[in-house]
C-alpha cells in the first residue's frame, strides 16, 4: 500500500426483518394514508450493510455558502457510493439507501447541523431478504443507513428525531430505528415498546407479489377495525403471540390469498403444522411472507424442523426473535 493512500474503516450492521403479529386498519386519513394498529416483532434474520468510511478525501461544505443553497442530490452523490446489484435501482434517487442519506442530509441542513467536512462512504448491501415480502427489507436498509450515517457524520440526532426523519422515507422505517418490539399506531410511526417472550418461527417466502396500492384499494379490505388501547394489547399478548385469537388478525390475509395462490398454498401448508407447533399460522404485512410461531416443545427437534423446511412448497427458514 502506498504510504499516503487513503484507508477506510468498515462498520457492519444487521438490517433485520420484521413481522407483524397482527395487522389492523383502523381508518383512512385526510391525506389518503391509512391508520394502522399492529405489533411489530424484529427478527435475528435480515440483510447486512457494510459501511466503508474513507479517512480521506472528504467532501467539504463551503461555510461561506448558505446551507439552504446546498444541492442535496449532488452532495449525496459525492458522499455516497452504493455497491451490490440489489442496492442499485433503475434510478439511484429512488433507492431507499440513497433516499435515507439524502433525507438525513436535508435534516442536518434544516437544523444547521451540517459539518464543514464529511467523510465519503461506500455502502455495500449483502441482500438476504426477498423484496416486497412484508418483511420490511427496504425500510430496514433505510433505517440502518440513517443510524450509521448519523454516527459516521457526527450529526448527533437523537432517536426521536431519527424516527421523524425515517417516517418521511416510509411508514415501516421508524420501527427499525426504534430497534425493539413495539405496538404501532398511526401510519406505523407512533411506537410503544412491548416486552414479548423469545420465540422461533418457521417462515415461508412464497414467490408472489401483490401491488400494495391495489390491496389498499380492494373493495373487500376491512378499513374500520376498532382501535384497541395500548393497555389492552399489552395485557392480551397471549391472544396474538403464539396463537391468534379474535379480534386479532391480519386484515390483508383474505384478500392476498384470493389474489396470490402461492401465498394461499404456503399458509395452508403452515396451517397443517399448527397442531404440532402449537401456534397459529399467519401472514406478515401485506404479504407475501407467511409464518408459524413454534412452541418450545418443537424448537429443539432439528430433524422435525428440517423435514418441515424440506417439504415446504417454497423457500423456508427457521428464525428467532431479536
Curated annotation (Swiss-Prot):
Pfam families: GHMP_kinases_N (PF00288). SUPFAM superfamilies: GHMP Kinase, C-terminal domain, Ribosomal protein S5 domain 2-like. Gene3D superfamilies: 3.30.230.10, GHMP kinase, C-terminal domain. One of its GO terms (molecular function) is ATP binding. Its EC number is 2.7.1.148. The active site is at 18, 172. It is an enzyme of class 2 (transferase). InterPro entries: GHMP_kinase_C_sf, GHMP_kinase_N_dom, IspE, Ribosomal_Su5_D2-typ_SF, Ribsml_uS5_D2-typ_fold_subgr. It catalyses: 4-CDP-2-C-methyl-D-erythritol + ATP = 4-CDP-2-C-methyl-D-erythritol 2-phosphate + ADP + H(+). Coiled coil: none annotated. Keywords: ATP-binding, Isoprene biosynthesis, Kinase, Nucleotide-binding, Transferase. Signal peptide: none annotated. Pathway: Isoprenoid biosynthesis; isopentenyl diphosphate biosynthesis via DXP pathway; isopentenyl diphosphate from 1-deoxy-D-xylulose 5-phosphate: step 3/6. Belongs to the GHMP kinase family. IspE subfamily. Catalyzes the phosphorylation of the position 2 hydroxy group of 4-diphosphocytidyl-2C-methyl-D-erythritol. This is 4-diphosphocytidyl-2-C-methyl-D-erythritol kinase. It comes from Psychrobacter arcticus (strain DSM 17307 / VKM B-2377 / 273-4).
